[in-house]
């Protein structure tokens, strides 16, 4: 089963350190940002320690890794040309890094229309993706299902379908299905996941899903908040998330946890991924998980 989490990529070890961290959590795949998600400061490809990273991955059976584009990219912005241009240029650079790392998909938040309206935002995203996808490689951009916070685009399957339909090289577009976001956008992930998946299949096609973000939610369905919760401790619940993780449709797809670190003290929060992954492998909810994480 391809199950992992977001891990860090920093210091001198970079990808090697990411692979070691993923192995320590008992993962078979993982997701990284190529640098801080809040800025565009990046190391050169030569400094990402890719060869050693791949050696560690091979040693520990890690594969199908995923890259996440930084949050600052907003190619839906119609009001600031500099924001749009930065997004296009930086996304092209990120795709080059993604290919060098050996990942097939880079996850992208489609963007926010910042008041110009959904139609204008979607048209701008299509313009940006058509420009980005002229580069010659086989990396896919995985458009993420969004919660609908603020002016986010991608809160409905129809919005994502409109983007995909408008892009010329759309064989290089995939979808990252985020359980928390989709729940927060109003879909009944908790009680009728197969119904949600059937709807997705009719509108976009399930074969477009190449990454799944497995997150519980701190909010009720339809809240449009996007606040992740640990597996089984939120409004989606363990049973639904366990069902999704073991779903036949996602057997060969990386499933990535982005659940929050545990702990009241901001300086002493601990990653939950090792125990959350064990829990999902055993298919049995542990209500003591957060306490056990703090005792690690």
UniProtKB/Swiss-Prot annotation:
Please list the residues that bind Zn(2+) 1: 68, 109, 144
- Annotated residues that bind Zn(2+) 2 are located at 144, 178, 213, 258
Q: Which cofactor does this sequence's record say it needs? A: Zn(2+)
Keywords annotated in UniProt? DNA damage, DNA repair, Endonuclease, Hydrolase, Metal-binding, Nuclease, Zinc
> What span is annotated as the signal peptide, if there is one?
none
Q: Please provide, alphabetically and separated by semicolons, the GO molecular function terms listed in this UniProt record.
A: deoxyribonuclease IV (phage-T4-induced) activity; DNA binding; DNA-(apurinic or apyrimidinic site) endonuclease activity; phosphoric diester hydrolase activity; zinc ion binding
Query: What reactions does this protein catalyze?
Result: Endonucleolytic cleavage to 5'-phosphooligonucleotide end-products
Against SMART domains, the record matches this protein to: AP2Ec
Identify which top EC class this enzyme belongs to.
Answer: hydrolase
Q: Name one GO biological process term.
A: base-excision repair
Amino-acid positions noted as binding Zn(2+) 3 in the UniProt annotation, renumbered to this chain: 181, 226, 228
**How the cofactor binds, per note?**
Binds 3 Zn(2+) ions.
Please name the InterPro entries in this protein's record.
Answer: AP_endonuc_2, AP_endonuc_F2_Zn_BS, Xyl_isomerase-like_sf, Xyl_isomerase-like_TIM-brl
Enzyme Commission (EC) number: 3.1.21.2
This chain's function reads: Endonuclease IV plays a role in DNA repair. It cleaves phosphodiester bonds at apurinic or apyrimidinic (AP) sites, generating a 3'-hydroxyl group and a 5'-terminal sugar phosphate.
Family from the record: Belongs to the AP endonuclease 2 family.
The entry's protein name is: Probable endonuclease 4
Q: Which organism is it from?
A: Staphylococcus aureus (strain MRSA252)
